[in-house]
């Protein structure tokens, strides 16, 4: 039944417009994140930033500052084609006279049929805080993608991987508190050193730290200004080379074998 609390009247210049709240909680709340870290991204912003990159589900993705796991979880949901909001309820579900219950059931069933939960992906999330890593695992479990993500306690200075053409997509500390700002030069230097050791990887990073490029040691290929809530941030994009096409890769493999 439609409640009066779902209706929002707006009076503007003697004209009244009545709007209906169909969602309840804000749409950026997917329903899986009960545990959060100090400075979490909204789920919607994390998903949008991932889609701004050329990452595809056949490429490895690592977040070395995973916090509550938002980037890895959203990436896994994109890869598995899990519709946003599958883990939450909407106010309009209770509107018996406006939206038939069967329509909700049919819509959810259709979304479930399109899911590919058995997909093989390599998505990893690291954080230096063991409790935060534990929270990320719990959030991933609620989202139904815990089997698709490897979470581990690890410092960014220890970031390395043998795979090529991977993606680092991350939200490192901004240093919003004065005492944290003193640690940022060393932290971003470590990010730059770790990235330099990754063969042919791309780095995508959202931060409000304006000296990020200076301490990373190179200028970003692209830089987008984005507001994370009320905080002006920058989405730095350090682009690695594209992987060779399958035919080219096969030819190079044959050449190497012939030379042996």
Which ranges hold each PLM region?
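A short, glycine/Asx- and small/polar-enriched loop/turn
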Residues: 10-15, 162-166
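C-terminal edge-of-domain segments
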Residues: 11-20, 236
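Conserved S-adenosyl-L-methionine
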Residues: 41-160, 176-177, 183
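Conserved acidic residues
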Residues: 5, 59, 166
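C-terminal catalytic and target-recognition region of SAM-dependent MTase-like enzymes
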Residues: 155-259
